[in-house]
């Protein structure tokens, strides 16, 4: 079978399975399995594919049709300028979280040697993205999951970036002080599990769901962060657009200066806060 015909059939299979971007996913999987970059893939469309390679390709296509995340099948994702290994040990880094990285860098642009804490680091994406962008920063990252931390450490070694990883809940007993505490915590209401996309079910529940209103992790995180920031230091959180305004209002009631920032689609996804008077 020629490569272009395999792409056509693979795209049709993923379309029938309801995969949101069937042609793109089929091409990326074939490139991965065959070890081709985009240019080589285009140039070799008329070449015959051997039976072993075709069998490997169909194995990946069928797993994607079963809604295994693309990143778990390719084993990697490019995020925030850093190449990361991605598998079932941690949440697949989302494109929208790159705006949280942007907001963090904006917050730190005037700090000469910032101390930063990433709470609930998962793959290590945020911590490593920050360290890559600000090499002089002292970056620490925590996670409750030892499996996620093992993946984050692998990604740090892969990228050659020096980040300190600590296993534990929220701030894990760290007192700081930090110029910035940043987190993409679990923020989905537990009821969302019943209607989650098939791909999401391959992510750890621990990284996704946080009680009835999705704020069971963010609220105690705020409480711990208050004493761990330098004067004028900031807390940056990614939340669900349904609950970000709620947490911002609670922060203001508790004496924080807090605002909700939109993502690139205009949805109220991020909360930026600092202690009043900071």
Curated annotation (Swiss-Prot):
Methylates the class 1 translation termination release factors RF1/PrfA and RF2/PrfB on the glutamine residue of the universally conserved GGQ motif. The keyword S-adenosyl-L-methionine applies. Keywords: Methyltransferase, S-adenosyl-L-methionine, Transferase. Its EC number is 2.1.1.297. The keyword S-adenosyl-L-methionine applies. One of its GO terms (biological process) is translational termination. Belongs to the protein N5-glutamine methyltransferase family. PrmC subfamily. This is Release factor glutamine methyltransferase. Substrate binds at residues 184-187. S-adenosyl-L-methionine binds at residues 120-124, 143, 184. Pfam families: MTS, PrmC_N. It is an enzyme of class 2 (transferase). It comes from Deinococcus radiodurans (strain ATCC 13939 / DSM 20539 / JCM 16871 / CCUG 27074 / LMG 4051 / NBRC 15346 / NCIMB 9279 / VKM B-1422 / R1).
